[in-house]
Amino acid sequence: MQLVYSFLLNVTDHTLLKQECLQQYQNADIDTLWKQTTEQDDSWYRVYNATQPYATANQTQQGTCFLSTVYASVQNKTYSNFYYHQLFNETSIRNNAAVDAVKNLAYHIWMGNKYRLDFKGKTLFGYEPKYTSGDYCIYENQYALPIGYATDHWISMDTFQQHNEAEQVLDLLSGIVLPEQVADTEMKQPDSLQTISEQEIESVLQTIEQEFPVTRNGNTLLISTEQPMTKTISLPKSCAGKLLLLSMEVDNTVVANSDDVFIMINGIKNKLTAPSWKYHNQNYHFTYLLSDVTDTLELSFSAGTYQVSSIHAYTLPEIVLEQAVQQVTPLETTAEQVRGDTISGTITTEKDGWFVLSVPYDTGFTVTVDGKETAYENVNLAFLGIPLSAGTHEIVWTYHAPGAATGKKITLITAGMLLLWAGLSYGIQRKQSERRILS
């Protein structure tokens, strides 16, 4: 009877993953592609699955495919803060417990996401098709930075914080951000960032006003619709060959009992959760970094009543991405040299500079350069960096989990006490048994 009940429960439970659904995440074609990728390229890089980015945030492939994504209740707060507040990443989910595979090309470049699994036949800005199997294709990111690299371009944190958020994207693509106490000189920021004029933004706002149920008050839009709406709007100027950076403030507290709201542009979604939601995502500031723009935008507004204001827009030319790759020297290493708690490799540089790992900063690391331990810094707001002189060097990073040594000592002491207690208990019981026999 229990077996019958268990069977009926499982076949009717819609929350269980069915075999056909599992095939979307793991199948022979996907396995073939990841195996082919790792066999052809044994260097150290990250990958991501664009076909199922949320369901596969914690899913590794082939044992040597590293990820920049994680869904967990415990995570590195410094890295999480960087993920949610730098590089114009979108926030498309209802909480801040996930570091998902966003659609932001700059983020994937910066984090060393070299290979992307997607459906075949796509034309993707910055990517080239590499391998194909069945309905799937591995695309190579032509601009992906190494996970570990050296550069002689940097600015101080003080200068970085004086820049607006779009200028900060350019800073991070042009060099590294150093703590004030170690940034003795600074690079000059390129002048490639272009601000979209107020007149051009006004033209777009007028188009939105004509196409959507909105009420305008200057540059503020009040959106009120019972159904989601999607329309394609024209831009006053083509953005082909450029990155388009957009930001805006969104407020869904203008009416009582508001639900979640979202705005999606060219398939990139930002969501603001209902004010009453217990895991509120605090995403009042929507940012988009678009790499597939020509002279139109596909714009979607969710149902609800909410306000949009403070709209800003910028463009960056593609050459910024090319220069970002050209001005760094990669760490020579393989996936096999990045195992367990150790990262090792060699690097040769012509100038004094800094070595950076796009690995989240933590106090548990030790690093040696040519066998000599070196102090490291928190660079680029959330990552690991060390000064590095010109020449050829062997670098080894080792991670020691905070509290691990203390935990091992406590475990050994506890085990010793248990053994002592067991021995004493056995001795006492034996003596008591002998007394009973004698008596």
Enumerate the language-model features and the residues they cover:
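Periplasmic/luminal catalytic loop of GT-C fold multi-pass membrane glycosyltransferases
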Residues: 90-136, 142
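Short, polar loop motifs at secondary-structure junctions
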Residues: 52-53, 117-123, 361-363
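Nucleotide-cofactor and metal-assisted catalytic machinery
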Residues: 55, 104-107, 114, 127-130, ...
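Membrane-proximal, lumen/periplasm-facing interface regions of secretory-pathway glyco-
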Residues: 3-35, 275-281, 311, 318-329
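Catalytic cores of secreted or luminal carbohydrate-active enzymes
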Residues: 109, 134-209, 307-323
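Active-site-proximal, structured, solvent-exposed surfaces of multi-pass membrane proteins
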Residues: 200-439
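Beta-sheet entry/capping signal
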Residues: 1, 44-47, 114-115, 136-138, ...
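Extracytoplasmic/lumenal acceptor-recognition loop(s) of multi-pass membrane glycoenzymes
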Residues: 2-17, 35-108, 145, 150-169, ...
